[in-house]
Each structure stands twice: as structure tokens, then as C-alpha cells.
Amino acid sequence: MVNLYNEEELARIEKIKETNDKLEEFFNNKRAEWTSNVEPLFDVIKNNINLESFSKVVEAQSIALSFRQNINEQISFFLNKRSKEEVKIKKVKQDKFMFYALGVGLKTSLGEKNTLIDAHIAENERNIQLIENYVEFLRSTSKNLEALGFTIKNKKK
């Protein structure tokens, strides 16, 4: 049986897995943080807006705008990270294709090569999926904050 993973490749995959596990925990914590920061803003509009609550409403509107800007910056940052990871994947795919086409001594079809390559890049793809899930969460949170702004605007009328 041919060994398809040398020690260097196993170490590379393990390092990415550890990074992904930390990234997943980081994103879970950030989701919880965003949720706890945003929820109180929605509590402000649960009651009718009157003169007493008006300053809280204006403050909530201001905070929501600030959060949306923060979210947009985070989205850009993580989309850039995703882009860099996609470049890494293309390089690994190329290297592994050459390995399976020329170096391993196995006769494989293109589909079989792709299956073998997919196993090598699974953790890289997990990294991209984690980033995409977090970016989607941020986009959803931003839309909710935008809707909050419209709700406040309509209630003030």
C-alpha cells in the first residue's frame, strides 16, 4: 500500500486543524459578544417612544450605526483572510495534483485524483467555511441593525 501522507503533510494538516479549532472557538465567542451587545438595542424599541425614552432611542440609533461600521470592517477583514486561504488551497491542489500525476506511482483517473486531493485540503476548506459562516452572521447582524434603524425612524413619526 502506498503511503499518501508523509510526516510533513500530516504536520501541515494537523497545524491547520488546530488553527481551525481555535478559529471556531473565536468565532463562537465573537457571535456571543455581538449578540449580547446588539440585543439591548432592540429592547429600547419594545415600548412606545415618548419624551422620556427619546434619548435612549437616539443613543440606540447611534450605537447601531457604530456597530454596523464595525461589522463592515470585520467583514472586509475576514473576506481578505478567506481570499488568502483560497490562494493557499490552489497551491496545495496544484502540488498534490503533480504528486498524484507524476510522483506516487499509482494509476488514477482525474476523478480519483480529485478525491485524493480533496482529502489533503479538507482542513483548508473547513477554514474557508468557518470564515464564510462568520461573515454571514455579521451580514445578518448588520441587516438587523439596519432594520432597527428603520423601525426607530418609523416609530418617531
Residue ranges and their predicted role:
Residues 38-72:
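Short, charge-rich amphipathic alpha-helices with coiled-coil/heptad character
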Residues 51-58, 83-129:
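Extended, amphipathic alpha-helical coiled-coil scaffold segments used for oligomerization/tethering
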Residues 61-64, 68, 75, 103, ...:
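Long, heptad-repeat alpha-helical coiled-coil rods/stalks that form the central scaffolding/linker segments
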Residues 30-31, 46, 71, 81, ...:
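Prokaryotic Sec-type signal peptides and long signal-anchor helices
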Residues 5, 13, 26, 54, ...:
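Sequence-level detector for tyrosine residue identity
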Residues 79, 83-91, 125-157:
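Long amphipathic alpha-helical coiled-coil segments
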Residues 1-52:
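Extended, charged low-complexity scaffolding/tethering segments
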